[in-house]
Amino acid sequence: MKKLFASLALAAVVAPVWAATQTVTLSVPGMTCSACPITVKKAISEVEGVSKVDVTFETRQAVVTFDDAKTSVQKLTKATADAGYPSSVKQ
């Protein structure tokens, strides 16, 4: 029983290391009004694997945190393009 508990405790500590979370900043130059970020955020949020989205109109950027085992940057940029706001990775 002690070995089982120790194994579970170790797994709980090590599991976050295996998580494949990434953060990317997308440039979304087509946002032309203060309502545009709402549409962009909704489109990105609907992509499976996205855990956080911050969209800023002033800088025309979207900072996206996602699980790269479930989605990719290409899927994120496709989601914004499909919503009418083409985007690219900000270098």
UniProtKB/Swiss-Prot annotation:
The keyword Methyltransferase does not apply. GO terms for molecular function: mercury ion binding; mercury ion transmembrane transporter activity. Keywords: Mercuric resistance, Mercury, Metal-binding, Periplasm, Plasmid, Signal, Transposable element. It comes from the Bacteria. Residues 22-88 form the HMA domain. Belongs to the MerP family. This is Mercuric transport protein periplasmic component. The gene is merP.
